[in-house]
Design a protein with these regions (language model features):
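The feature marks the mature, well-folded catalytic cores of soluble enzymes
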Residues: 1-201
């Protein structure tokens, strides 16, 4: 009688011998043609963000650092980390263990693109050192360029098609969950608040 490891190997070998016909990706031209578009993508993004509990702040390249300071100062003197704007004298987690993220009060970084229809912001590992920081911080601050806001998820995925990041996630609003009684709880599984800084010009 064959032992378990031998039986396992035999099964895997048999599976590898099977040649399945290659399936082509389904065409999604029809979906793209019917995808929603907005006359004002930035305005729609703001409405979507506020509807899911986020706050939106506008600034230009001249006062972006001041806006970051104002937003972070609202949450007191807690530890802020990995703020992707030069000129802020905050602590940085870049050389620390991911476990240190449990101490975060405010965590700020930049998003690559935003989506108007659902206020989702794409954050990749290019902008963060420890991905767990996005979930463990009490308050999350994300910066997005107004020109990087697209209409819908179809356009967002098209822009991400050729990007090869090891990790990335769409974030929309603060953490939210609801039980069977439909009691909404904010911040149970992630950040309690989300502030979005939209840079224009």
């Amino acid at each position: 009688m064959a032992n378990k490891s031998t039986t396992r190997d035999l099964i895997l070998d048999k599976i590898r011998e099977v040649e399945l016909p290659r399936a082509e990706h389904p065409l999604v031209d029809g979906l793209l043609a019917g995808a929603i578009e907005y006359a004002d993508t930035v305005g729609t993004f703001v409405d979507s963000a506020e509807s899911v509990g986020a706050r939106v702040h506008f600034c230009n390249t001249d006062n972006v650092v001041d806006i970051w300071r104002d937003v972070c100062n609202e949450f007191g003197t807690g530890k802020t980390a990995n703020v992707a704007i030069r000129g802020l004298d905050d602590d940085d987690l870049t050389d620390e263990s991911p476990h240190s993220a449990s101490e975060l009060v405010v965590y700020g970084t930049s998003g690559m693109l935003g989506v108007a229809e659902n206020a989702a912001i794409w954050v990749s590992d290019r902008a963060i050192k420890h991905r767990v920081s996005l979930c463990l911080t009490q308050h999350l601050v994300l910066q997005i360029d107004a020109k990087a806001i697209v209409n819908n998820m179809h356009e967002a995925y098209a822009k991400l098609q050729d990007i090869r990041d090891d990790y990335g996630v769409f974030i929309s609003g603060p953490s939210k969950t609801a039980d069977i009684e439909q009691s909404l709880v904010i911040g149970a599984h992630g950040a309690r608040t989300l502030d979005i800084i939209v840079v224009e010009g």
